[in-house]
Amino acid sequence: MSKSTAQIRQAFLNFFADKGHQKVSSSSLVPSDDPTLLFTNAGMNQFKDVFLGTEQRKYTRATSSQRCVRAGGKHNDLENVGYTARHHTFFEMLGNFSFGDYFKHQAIGYAWSFLTEVLKLPKDKLLVTVYSEDDEAFDIWHNDIGIPKEKIIRIATSDNFWSMGDTGPCGPCSEIFYDHGEHIWGGPPGSPEEDGDRFIEIWNLVFMQFNRQANGDMLPLPKPSIDTGMGLERISAIIQNVHSNYEIDIFQNLIKATAKIVGVTSLEDKSLRVVADHIRSCSFLISDGVMPSNEGRGYVLRRIIRRAVRHGNKLGANGVFFYKLVAALATEMGDAYPELNEQRAVIEKVLRVEEEQFSRTLERGMLILNDALNELEGKVVPGDVVFKLYDTYGFPADLTNDVAREKGLSIDEEGFEQAMAEQRKRAQKASNFDVDYNEQLRSDLESIFVGYEHEDNTATITELFFKGQSVNELAAGAEGTVILDESPFYAEAGGQAGDTGTLVTDAGGFSVKDTVKLGKAIAHKGAALSKLSVGDSVLAKVNGVRRHAIKLNHSATHLMHAALKSILGEHVNQKGSLVQADRLRFDFSHFEAMSKEQVLAVETMVNEQILANHPLQTQLMGLEQAKEAGAMALFGEKYDDDVRVVSMGSFSMELCGGTHVERTGDIGLFKIISESGIASGVRRIEAVTGLTALQHVQQQTFELSSISAVLKTDVNSAGERVVQLIEQTKTLEKEVAKLKQEIANSAGSDLLSQINEINGVKVLSYHVQGIESGALRTMIDDLKNQIGSGVILLGLATGDKVSLIAGVTKDLTHKVKAGELVNFVAQQVGGKGGGRPDMAQAGGSQPENLDTAIASVSEWLQERL
């Protein structure tokens, strides 16, 4: 009987768990502390530091079903999604991993056993590839597994040799392929027809056994490791006896749901496949804290959403539709990934808001694009058209390319990139794969942090740095870095500023200006007050006053984070944090500005928890245990297997290594001083605590009292009094404007006496005074109506600015153009202008030349009338 996709996923995890592998949950789609990745795109991403040897875990075998996104950056499958059988923006990667435990024999044996015994794939339908020089893998497949030699293909290209980068861990691969049969076109891997659909790769086994050096040398790793990956959608298609991933159960159900929502009956349209794919990536990205924006990961999400909306529109969707598919997705995948149900309301709202915003410009943008395509003489859409659609209507270039491709056209990508110029800071900027892993700093030194219990302690200098080099001595007055065997100084981490203070010796010591992590060592940066040597004993003393202020702000940050989730929703996730002595700053994911009421509600909730005076409790526990207990793990943070959990009553529980108050009451007072947006989908709150908060409130109270005194009212009535004054001012401004218009009308009537004639044509050129520049337009319209036929040029000087306006009745525009006339005068007063033949305006910056310029009009007109 055919297995469902969910059953295949579970069977894989259970199989390897039975083989002693630790089941590890899928990591976030936002890579943790990895600048080389835009999104998690493989199962091994979360284990990279384990493979590099910079991280230790309690297990040496692991298995996972990893959520992956490939759209943007190096792995960009977006333009092919929906048009091929196996391209997706979101997919699941099944994997088993060995960290210096088993190697090729067991990895190959496990893979073969799972495919042929658990999934019961026919052995004669499988063939494998090995790296051309990997005789060991070839022999295992042939001698141990029993695969005929003719079904083991040696591949010499990079397809069968994997590396993490230009340097670092690498090794040969062995790929397992499934043969769909002779009735499907295509050849085996390595043949000219290998791109056909007959032979489909289903599992890649990577044998990490070398460490590539910068000079190209490959040294054997002391503990070879295994990294494997099998696409869940691909293996499901084979087990369910279909040839396209879009025909498996999950996609068919999503496609049917899409068709029902947009109102179509046929399930064959490729746009249905696009929408079904995109709802998966968009929903999971939002659940992992990514919000639509104009840069980085948020821009990739926006591109995917807008591509889905365009395809829904193409299908005939009426109104917003995309967000309605979240329910169907939760039905399909909510059991495996509970976050879909937990954050369903937030995902739906974010998608709905984004779709509504884009829908306002989609129709107009499509008209512009279709007009451009209809007028196109060649086969390439110009880059400036692509840019206009992006800049004005929010059309990502790949969306325009999508439409063009449907009409057999392409876009001028180079021209688009040129038009974007420095405006374009998109997802590709966040993806940098040129990393030399051998040059990443490693240190055998380790400092013991004792700062939770003490603010001073005796320690020994274990290493000194001067100008980036390790030294034995540091001279008095020299700036450098000191490493201690143990230290009470907190090293900057998790947004909390590093401690300052002094390392005291009999001769003087060292002034610590900042503290940071250097591998596992605590690095004290500053200046030597006296000569220091490795091995010296020091008294490490933290600046206690500053540390205390930081504690207040850090604990308040935890309370505020919990309050934001309570008031705004569980989608709120930390996007950045700064905890200093004088303030705290907190960036978080949210799709709209907070209302004044919401800001006050958060502030009140935090102060209620401060008044409750909860004791702060810390506890060390396993990471999974902490998550199960409800501890909040922050996106972008990397945690050890054992973590420190900081709790404040039942209100807040977070994983945190920072320093905190003993009771929430120690914070004293919490005051939000600003809430603003720093990027699309990211808000920022700045706040103060303790005496700083009190001083802020006192200053505001003083200012309000001063304002009330000026307004001659009490503090409680100041707001009402300001509103009254604003209304009075508006009334007076209207009266003044009315009077100025009356003056202008009167001046216009007086100007009729200044009209001259040139060759029988009425001409008025005049320097008017005493009116607003905005009245010139009305004045010239009235004058044109009164004279019937003629040419008028009016100038006005206001301070150091000149305003000019020219009017020509339509019967004379074949002789005199208003734009040419006003530009002629403007050039003489340091400006320029233009407009229609019958009406044009200009400005200038040389009022001292205005009279001379106006006097020159008659001679200029003599030549034209």
From Swiss-Prot:
Compartments where found: Cytoplasm
Matches recorded under CDD domains: AlaRS_core
Signal peptide: none
GO cellular component, one term: cytosol
Annotated Gene3D superfamilies: 2.40.30.130, 3.10.310.40, 3.30.54.20, 6.10.250.550, Bira Bifunctional Protein, Domain 2 (3.30.930.10), Threonyl-trna Synthetase, Chain A, domain 2 (3.30.980.10)
Binding, Zn(2+): H554, H558, C656, H660
Cofactor note: Binds 1 zinc ion per subunit.
Enzyme class of the recorded protein, top EC level: ligase
GO biological process: alanyl-tRNA aminoacylation; negative regulation of DNA-templated transcription
GO molecular-function terms, A-Z: alanine-tRNA ligase activity; aminoacyl-tRNA deacylase activity; ATP binding; tRNA binding; zinc ion binding
Cofactor(s), by name: Zn(2+)
Chemical reaction(s) catalysed: tRNA(Ala) + L-alanine + ATP = L-alanyl-tRNA(Ala) + AMP + diphosphate
PROSITE patterns named among the record's database cross-references: AA_TRNA_LIGASE_II_ALA
Keyword terms of this UniProt record: Aminoacyl-tRNA synthetase, ATP-binding, Cytoplasm, Ligase, Metal-binding, Nucleotide-binding, Protein biosynthesis, RNA-binding, tRNA-binding, Zinc
Superkingdom: Bacteria
Domain notes: Consists of three domains; the N-terminal catalytic domain, the editing domain and the C-terminal C-Ala domain. The editing domain removes incorrectly charged amino acids, while the C-Ala domain, along with tRNA(Ala), serves as a bridge to cooperatively bring together the editing and aminoacylation centers thus stimulating deacylation of misacylated tRNAs.
Family: Belongs to the class-II aminoacyl-tRNA synthetase family.
Purpose: Catalyzes the attachment of alanine to tRNA(Ala) in a two-step reaction: alanine is first activated by ATP to form Ala-AMP and then transferred to the acceptor end of tRNA(Ala). Also edits incorrectly charged Ser-tRNA(Ala) and Gly-tRNA(Ala) via its editing domain.
Designated name of the protein: Alanine--tRNA ligase
